[in-house]
Amino acid sequence: MAQLFHPSSNTIAKAIIVGGVLGVPTLIGVGYAVNMSYGYQVFKPIEQPVQFSHKHHNMDDGIDCRYCHTAVEKSTSAGIPDTHTCMSCHSQIWSDSPELAPVKASYVSGQPINWNRVHDLPDFVYFNHSLHINKGVGCESCHGRIDQAPLAMKVHTFSMQWCLDCHRHPEKFLRPKEAVWTMGWKAGDAGINPDTGKKYTQIELGTKLVKEYKIGHERYLTDCYTCHH
């Protein structure tokens, strides 16, 4: 009987089967990631009464995060500056801009601006900004390159799984306290590891900082009570 199919057909058939087996989980994984990002409103700019640009103020003008977020090193909340802080500059700069009309009105009336929350954690989750800052967690680790953001938005899901990834392996994320505010920081910026004679890797430096900053054991960091109380 004459051969109906070319010998290469077997290879093609196997490739289709393997592609189907591997492709379906891949599609499911991609779909799950997209759904998670959408559900958690990741990369979605939030409309505000005043379109404040972190990029303009931080990257372009070099204003330190703590000039506006004054409580971040000692309070559970980073804090939103009142309009007195805004007007300390804008009474002299861009004072006639229509964009600043709500800021000026708030300053005169004493009524705060009703900003729309960007990072809205569930009511039953406890998060302490000062604790993370003082343990070497950089702003960038949670807020991404906020210095490059014309409009504020979430860049991570802030899901429990996302938090646990850090709590289980803090050495992957820690940096020296003085570098907490430095955007684009890399472990190699910390200098030479005397044990290797080479620039620090993140794991080398992070492991050192876990001990130096007395970071709790994974068992404590992943205990329900640590964040839910």
Where are the regions that the model predicts?
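Aromatic-capped interface at the extracytoplasmic side
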Residues: 28-46
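Extended active-site neighborhood of metal-dependent phosphoesterases/phosphodiesterases
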Residues: 99-102, 114
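Sequence context surrounding c-type heme c attachment/ligation sites in exported
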Residues: 46-99, 128-229
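Short, solvent-exposed interaction modules
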Residues: 115-133
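Hydrophobic membrane-insertion alpha-helices, especially the h-region
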Residues: 14-32
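N-terminal Lys/Arg-rich, disordered targeting/topogenic segments
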Residues: 1-10
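Amphipathic alpha-helical "stem/stalk" segments
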Residues: 104-107, 135
